[in-house]
UniProtKB/Swiss-Prot annotation:
Any GO CC annotation of this UniProt entry: plasma membrane
UniProt topology in membrane: Single-pass type I membrane protein
Domain remarks: The transmembrane domain is necessary for interaction with KCNMA1.
Protein's name according to its UniProt entry: Leucine-rich repeat-containing protein 38
Signal peptide coordinates: 1-27
Subcellular location: Cell membrane
GO biological process: positive regulation of voltage-gated potassium channel activity; potassium ion transmembrane transport
Oligomeric form and interacting partners: Interacts with KCNMA1.
Length: 294
């Protein structure tokens, strides 16, 4: 039985090592610095991926200035105590569904200066306590109307310096606590689709830290850009009479349906009239025969 002793000792040592690895306060990843028991600083290290492992009780993580392309899907499941995440100036291209699962304590999230192009529905669904979200200086061209659902505590949203030409008002209406919104630095297109957003912006101008002057848009069929300060509701008056594709489809379908109903009704009426006309001569002939018999 003695030969088993080294094996048992090795197993015990491995178990102890694993427990130390998973224990709160575990040593920082190589190349990073722990400035306090709950802060990990991995800024400007040229890292190609999120280093691992961190102390499980880390609350503030700084990974700005690296080459990281994705946030692991299970990242917040292991580091659910994270409150502050600085992910600026990386190579992040997309946010996979479920990326923020387990991020219930996250309050500050900076994803600026990355390569994001789209925000899908529920991109931050589990991050319900977020207070500040920065998406500035990305390549965003589209934001789903449900991208910010459940962010009822969000007060600061930065969407400036992207490639947005339009934005659904529904996406902003989902943010009841919003106090500050950056929209400047985008190539907005002042067409009829922009009319609803323009109305929202006018009603919530106090939430724009740089005001209407810094937000510019291009007029349809024109190359020049103008400040929203120069526009008014009257600028979109023609849009009140314009029809969307859905409206046009409904009108066309209704017209076709009415036409078909009219054709069927006309055919039925013509058939009835023809039957009556055929029956009338027979009735007259019967009346003449009765007169002769008399």
């Amino acid at each position: 039985m003695r030969p088993r002793a080294p094996a048992c000792a090795a197993a015990a040592l491995g178990l102890c090592s694993l427990l130390l690895l998973l224990a709160p306060g575990h040593a920082c990843p190589a190349g990073c610095a722990c400035t306090d028991p709950h802060t990990v600083d991995c800024r400007d290290r040229g890292l190609p991926s999120v280093p691992d492992p961190f102390p499980l009780d880390v609350r503030k993580l700084l990974v700005a200035g690296n080459r990281i392309q994705r946030i692991p899907e299970d990242f917040f499941i292991f580091y659910g105590d994270l409150v502050y995440l600085d992910f600026r100036n990386n190579s992040l291209r997309s946010l996979e569904e479920g990326t923020f699962s387990g991020s219930a304590k996250l309050v500050f999230l900076d994803l600026s200066y990355n390569n994001l192009t789209q925000l899908g529905a529920g991109a931050f669904r589990s991050a319900g306590r977020l207070v500040k979200l920065s998406l500035a200086n990305n390549n965003l061209v589209g934001v789903h109307e449900d991208a910010f659902e459940t962010l009822e505590s969000l007060q600061v949203l930065e969407l400036n310096d992207n490639n947005l030409r339009s934005l659904s008002v529904a996406a902003l209406a989902a943010l009841p606590a919003l106090r500050s919104l950056r929209l400047d630095g985008n190539p907005w297109l002042c067409d009829c689709d922009f009319a609803h957003l323009f109305s929202w912006i006018q009603e919530n101008a106090s939430k724009l830290p740089k005001g209407l002057d810094e937000i510019q848009c291009s007029l349809p069929m024109e190359s020049r850009r103008i400040s929203l300060r120069e526009l008014s509701e009257a600028s979109f008056s023609e849009c009140r009479f314009s029809l969307s594709l859905t409206d046009l489809c409904i009108i066309i379908f209704s017209g076709v349906a009415v036409s078909i109903a009219a054709i069927i009704s006309s055919f039925f009426l013509a058939t009835v009239v023809q039957c009556l006309q055929r029956c009338a001569p027979n009735k007259d002939a019967e009346d003449e025969d009765e007169d002769k018999d008399d």
